[in-house]
Amino acid sequence: MKIVILDGYAANPGDLDYHLLEQLGEVVVYPRTSDDEKVERAKDADIILLNKVQMDAETLAQLPNLKYIGIQATGFNVVDIKAAKKQGIIVTNIPAYSTDSVAQMTFALILAVTNRVEHYTQENRNDRWAYNKDFCYWDTPLMELAGKKLGIMGLGNIGMKVANIARQFGMDVCACTSKNSCDLPEWIQKVSKDGLLATSDILTLHCPLSDDTYHLINKENIEKMKDTAILVNTGRGPLVDEEAVAKALHDQKLGAYCADVMSQEPPSKENPLFKEPNAYLTPHIAWATFEARKRLNRQVAANVKAFLEGNPINVVNP
């Protein structure tokens, strides 16, 4: 059984091993694979594992030996799952491996804004505190989370983890979700999308990317938000219209934008968000803690093992 990993570096730059996979077959690892290389590298594989290498219908048609695609991530929009099913290829993902890490990054971004961490670190380096007349130095207000309203769009594993952390900060938590109110904890208020937009001091996105959620936050919806609102996106870049967000920041119609994801990755250096001082952007690292990648690595092998035993798990194209 030949197992080919097409873009192994992001999930495993060398601090993990593949011994669990190697017990299941011949493993070939490529750090990165371009569009021009993917067919040649995957043509003899029974199993391919990938993170962000695109597998569209045209590519899959050139891989008649392929039996299984293991996506080394939770999102599975990199694979045409309908075409894969038509071709008899099972596709699996890795749910919930990064829940704690992504929730942690969500609050790292929020606290970076509310506590002005970057600003005051730089001010210290510029000796502003050293030459200050008072025992402390601050020139711009900080914000306490207790009593503020956190709005959550998407109340899956990560959204619920974020909600629980917010509760510990003393925040009021509301959510726009398809879940019934009776299935939610009593301390989470279910509201409409417009209600969430209008009342949230901080709005955080944890939705999957789909036709319905593409540019969920656009010019029209930003106009419904508070001018001081903090928008957080650790879900998928295209959930927001980045041009509209950049303009809202520039026009002071949005307090801050915090994101670990962007519409194009790697992003263009011309992206207008890079010009906005109230845009706090990290390079898609929320999932990448050692602990989360270790869980990912183990679950990838578990998915492959289950497939080989005839009882596939975490299938996204049943």
PLM-predicted stretches and their roles:
Residues 91, 172, 219, 228-318:
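Rossmann-like dinucleotide-binding domain for NAD(H)/NADP(H)
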Residues 1-45, 170-174:
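N-terminal glycine-/charge-rich "phosphate-binding" loop or analogous flexible N-terminal tail
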Residues 155-156:
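Glycine-rich Rossmann-fold phosphate-binding loop(s) that bind the pyrophosphate
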Residues 55-61, 179-272:
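Rossmann-like adenosine-cofactor binding region
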Residues 159-160:
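N-terminal Rossmann-fold NAD(P) dinucleotide-binding loop
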Residues 31, 72-73, 89-100, 177:
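Short beta->alpha connector loops at strand-helix junctions that form conserved
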Residues 87, 95-149, 316:
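Phosphate-binding beta-alpha-beta segment of Rossmann-like dinucleotide-binding domains, i.e.
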